[in-house]
């Protein structure tokens, strides 16, 4: 039974069907190169060998009772597979098929970027950063400014002259001795006139002068004589002032007193009679005459009308009535007496 099944399978998968399929593939596009036809034949041979191996495995594992029915089904499957493979090859004109194993390998290994090179290897300065450079530059600037300030200070000291030693410092170091008298300034001693020669005095006497001029000359001559007896060097300023004689009082000329002129007495204004002096306000008023000289606010001082009247009357001074007309104050803006 097994041998029969193998023969049927061989008869079903004969070379006639494969040749027909190859002729059908070659007829529609005769202009293709021979390389495409060779590839197609190799693919069909591979597919037929795979299907044949699978059928052999099935027949070996199946029981004897089912040998007649299954080979017929298996004969139909490879034909349909061959036709479907030929149609796919027509659609893909010359495109090389990719195996699923290659696709999995490509997806599994993603492209990794190369690691960045080490900075210490490329940069010559190593670990230096921008902050370190800034700190170093600021330190250099500070040192430069300090050096410049020191240089200016040294230049000023050289330009300034050396201080001259004072005289009092040397005198303190010397041994104590008699205190040197300082020369007295000329302003202390009063100026003393030198005595005039006698020739000049005679000339002055010959010139006629008034009595006052003669007295002056005598006084000057006396002062000159006193100054000759006392030496100038031995006298101090205070002694000179004491020894000076007081000046003589000169009799001044008496001016004739002016005669006292009699003062002119202004004529006084004639005094007016008492009745004319009193102002018109002093006359009795009508309402006083009617009421018998009694004022209304004397009766009821609590009434509001009476208060107003009192305020109006109080503005007027009581002394105005008694004053005469001549002594009353003048009103501003009027030239009346």
From Swiss-Prot:
GO CC annotation: sarcoplasmic reticulum; sarcoplasmic reticulum membrane
Annotated stretches, region: Disordered: 23-125, 159-337
Record's compositionally biased regions (Basic and acidic residues): 49-59, 69-79, 199-213, 236-277, 285-309, 316-325
Biased composition (Low complexity): 165-180
GO annotation terms (biological process): skeletal muscle contraction
Coiled-coil segments on the chain, per record: none
Record key words, sorted: Endoplasmic reticulum, Membrane, Sarcoplasmic reticulum
Domain of life, source organism: Eukaryota
Disulfide bonds: none
Subcellular location: Sarcoplasmic reticulum membrane; Endoplasmic reticulum membrane
Keyword Endoplasmic reticulum: yes
Ranges for region Mediates interaction with CACNA1S: 1-84
Feature: compositional bias, Acidic residues: 214-225
Pfam entry (one): JSRP
Biased composition (Basic residues): 326-337
Subunit relationships: Interacts with CACNA1S, CACNB1 and calsequestrin.
Main function: Involved in skeletal muscle excitation/contraction coupling (EC), probably acting as a regulator of the voltage-sensitive calcium channel CACNA1S. EC is a physiological process whereby an electrical signal (depolarization of the plasma membrane) is converted into a chemical signal, a calcium gradient, by the opening of ryanodine receptor calcium release channels. May regulate CACNA1S membrane targeting and activity.
Protein name: Junctional sarcoplasmic reticulum protein 1
Species the sequence originates in: Bos taurus
The encoding gene: JSRP1
């Amino acid at each position: 039974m097994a041998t029969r099944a193998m023969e049927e399978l061989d008869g079903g998968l004969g070379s006639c069907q494969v040749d027909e399929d190859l002729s059908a593939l070659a007829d529609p596009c005769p202009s293709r190169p021979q390389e495409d036809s060779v590839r197609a034949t190799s693919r069909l041979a591979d597919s037929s060998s795979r299907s044949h191996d699978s059928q052999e495995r099935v027949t070996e594992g199946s029981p004897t009772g089912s040998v007649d029915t299954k080979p017929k089904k298996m004969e139909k499957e490879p034909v349909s597979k061959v036709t479907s493979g030929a149609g796919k090859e027509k659609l893909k004109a010359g495109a090389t098929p990719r195996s699923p194993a290659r696709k999995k390998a490509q997806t599994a290994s993603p492209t990794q970027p190369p690691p960045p090179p080490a900075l210490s290897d490329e940069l010559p300065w190593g670990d230096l950063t921008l902050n370190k450079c800034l700190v170093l530059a600021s330190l250099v600037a500070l040192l430069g400014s300090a050096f410049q300030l020191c240089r200016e200070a040294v230049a000023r000291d050289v330009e300034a002259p050396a201080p001259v030693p004072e005289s009092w410092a040397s005198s303190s170091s010397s041994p104590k001795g008699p205190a040197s008298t300082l020369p007295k300034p000329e302003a202390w001693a009063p100026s003393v006139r030198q005595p005039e020669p006698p020739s000049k005095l005679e000339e002055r006497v010959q010139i006629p002068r008034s009595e006052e001029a003669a007295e002056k000359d005598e006084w000057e001559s006396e002062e000159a004589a006193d100054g000759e007896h006392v030496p100038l060097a031995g006298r101090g300023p205070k002694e000179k002032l004491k020894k000076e004689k007081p000046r003589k009082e000169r009799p001044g000329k008496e001016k004739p007193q002016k005669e006292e002129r009699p003062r002119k007495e202004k004529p006084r204004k004639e005094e007016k009679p008492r009745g004319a002096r009193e102002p018109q306000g002093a006359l009795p008023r009508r309402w006083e005459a009617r009421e018998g000289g009694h004022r209304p606010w004397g009766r009821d001082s609590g009434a509001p009308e009476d208060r107003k009247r009192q305020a109006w009357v109080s503005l007027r001074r009581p002394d105005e009535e008694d004053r005469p007309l001549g002594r009353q104050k003048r009103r501003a803006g009027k030239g009346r007496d």
